[in-house]
């Protein structure tokens, strides 16, 4: 199977500079406030929560303070070091695991009531088969009725700027040629890292992917341009600046 972590993503993971500057860089990102509000609505009752690709721990601190039993997994030792300092500063408790989220079966994590995979972490996994296997693995780590929340980028939002339209045109040409991962988006040079790319979804595609993983979609929110609220109205599938999703492991399933 194709390696789920591309060299560019691995360089991002391994960068201490990225980790140490992460919270400052994203301080004014409105999605970081809005997604927390949405998660609080979806996950009202404290329980066991697994944060996949937890980064510097913004959700770990928040949910630990709410009384959740939280576990964070990230491959970056530098991100986890920042998360550990933030948890200590807030006198919050969490289990931190340095590991590959695409290999959950080998981490001995147990079962959870909730799992979150935020800020396009799902799109950072390369390969359709790898993304499906990852979601199926999450399902295996949820108790029956357990919830998964995630954020992904919207492919069609690329229509609104020139570089995005060029990406779409190139992607469709790759698709016609039968190339694998035709809609993988090159973001080379992002934060000074060469070779970064990520997968961007359509609403219908994310619905199909969740169904194939055995997860029932509870809610799909279309994000407005500033990603600080829900987009409504006509053609929102084309206009949305990404999606927040909540899916459930059906009751009565192992």
PLM feature segments, named:
Residues 114-129:
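A short SAM/SAH-binding and catalytic strip from SAM-dependent methyltransferases
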Residues 149-209, 219-226:
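SAM-dependent methyltransferase
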């Amino acid at each position: 199977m194709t390696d789920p972590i591309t060299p560019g993503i691995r360089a991002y993971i391994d960068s201490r500079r990225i980790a140490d500057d992460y919270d400052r860089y994203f301080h004014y990102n409105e999605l970081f406030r809005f997604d927390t509000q949405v998660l609080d609505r979806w996950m009202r009752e404290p329980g066991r929560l697994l944060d996949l690709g937890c980064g510097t721990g913004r959700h770990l601190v928040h949910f630990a303070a709410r009384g959740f039993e939280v576990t964070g997994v990230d491959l970056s030792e530098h991100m986890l070091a920042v998360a550990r300092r933030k948890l200590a500063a807030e006198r919050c408790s969490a289990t931190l695991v340095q590991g590959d989220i695409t290999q959950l079966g080998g981490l001995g994590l147990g079962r959870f009531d909730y799992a979150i995979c935020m800020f396009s972490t799902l799109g950072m996994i390369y390969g359709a088969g790898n993304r499906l296997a990852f979601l199926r693995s999450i399902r295996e780590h949820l108790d029956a009725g357990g919830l998964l929340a995630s954020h992904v980028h919207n492919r069609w939002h690329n229509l609104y700027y020139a570089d995005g339209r060029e990406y779409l045109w190139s992607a469709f040409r790759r698709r016609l040629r039968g190339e694998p991962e035709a809609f993988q988006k090159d973001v080379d040079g992002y934060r000074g890292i060469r070779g970064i790319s990520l997968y961007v979804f359509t609403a219908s595609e994310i619905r199909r992917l969740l169904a194939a993983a055995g997860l029932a979609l509870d809610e799909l929110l279309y994000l407005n341009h500033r990603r600080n609220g829900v987009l409504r109205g006509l053609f929102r599938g084309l206009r949305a600046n990404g999606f927040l999703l909540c899916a459930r492991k059906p009751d009565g399933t192992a």
